[in-house]
Amino acid sequence: MPKPATDFNDPINLQVMWNRLIFIADQADNVLGKTAFSPIVRENHDYVTVLLDSKGRALAQCTWSIPVFITSLPAAAQNYFLPKFPADKLEEGDVLATNDPEIGTGHLPDVTMITPIFKNGKVVAYAGSIAHLPDIGGAPLHSEASDIYEEGIRFPIIKLLKAGVPNQDVFDIIEASVRLPTEVRGDLESMIAANNVMGRELVKFLDEYGLDDVEGLATAIHSRSEAQTRKAIREWPNGSYAAEVLLDGYDVDVTLKASVIIKDDSIHVDYTGTSDQVLHSINCRTNYRYAHSVYALKCLLDPETPNNEGCIVPITDEAPLGCILNPQHWTAGNSRNLIGHVIPSLIFKALEGVVPEKVMGDSGGAPIWAANCVGQRNDGTQYGSVQNFHGGQGARAELDGLDTLSFPSNCKVTAIEMFEVAVPVLTERKELIADSGGAGKHRGGLGQRVVLRNLGKNPMNIYLASERVRHPCFGVVEGQSGSAGKVMKDGKPQFPKGKVVLKTGQRLEVETPGGGGWGAASDRSHALIEQDLSENLITAKAAKEIYGYSGPIAAAAE
């Protein structure tokens, strides 16, 4: 049987081969998700699978992914994994891993794992995966730790497997240090399996096409993607465009500032002027910051090209050492998403005057809200699981924001039924909040109200990570702000980044923020206002007072 065409200069051949690589990453994604033990990996999809070339550059990424992983895995491979373990120090069956936040994704629960792929005795590529483990020891995932040493166990780049044999001492140390050893070990095994799938399928792909390595294909993919990104940048006017965003922070407000500097076919983002690092777990490390800088700009420049190294090269960023977006190595950062998730909105705001038709309003899912529920079951065994609560997406030039969406995280929510199996709670309410979306020509997505009741006989400790309680999500292009968030226990306000203890029968109620609007509310069509009224997404009062609507209003909307 003749070999398939391998002309990398032929766009059709290149696209077919490229899609095959993405499918390989998707196969591994499916394996990891289907075999993972913990809800945060299995249900929330808080993981990624990536194929890297022999230099550690991103070649193909699974279709469904967390944006932070766009740059994290290839940067970790190129800057840390490969220098410590070059190809001549690796053998088939080796698996490398670390959870060092300076190397991976900025916080300890994320484990970065890389497996060399051999063909004819030579390393031709690497399979990479990152997954958010359900526990890593230390303080439960929230915002109160004052340094990284309180947040859990940290292990450097190690050989988790050597020539296919597990390093049992390392596994023993990890399992002895966490609250959920079975789930943690199971998730690590799932990552190993996913990487093995990528390795096996890539070798089959190379054999099918008669290739010895991926070098030529990688060069074609990277150069095409980089050229496409640079072409899109050249369509924007040169200049420096600035913005700032005010956040709740932990106990004092945090200011994020950015200057987006466009010069010919490259973009540089400078975060000078951003608030200093803090003695709480909301510091955002360089790798996490850069990932969101790239993601935001890719959304505006070239959202269709699949993620790979070429998309990254034209974009750089920087932040002063010691600020909350470039903290010292010892600082805490387990809840770094409370800061990092806002970076895309900050960049959109800076570019509002450059590409108003492409930016969207600030999102209530930025950052994602999380409740880490920990305690003892009635039989004395321990449980622990994280539930996410999403706010409304910001509105866009052509569409309303989506309700309760986790932009920019792209995380799913653990199904209520699965969460109630993992944790002794009853979800009494889960509903959209009318009028929570920021008004505009296009309305911001709605936030939600969720009520959880402790059904267990023992107290439940809930560690909260939330934002936008004092500073709601802003609109763009004259759009209005969405509603702010709330956290309550039995009707009494709670500290949104603290620990809430629920005794038997007590309730936690959260109201997530609504997304910001796009365009002036006076420009919203009557048809859309009437549709919102009919679906109880806005009230009659809002229709009259905010949108200036004077048409008929059904009784249900009064």
PLM region spans:
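Active-site Gly/Thr loop motif
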Residues: 96
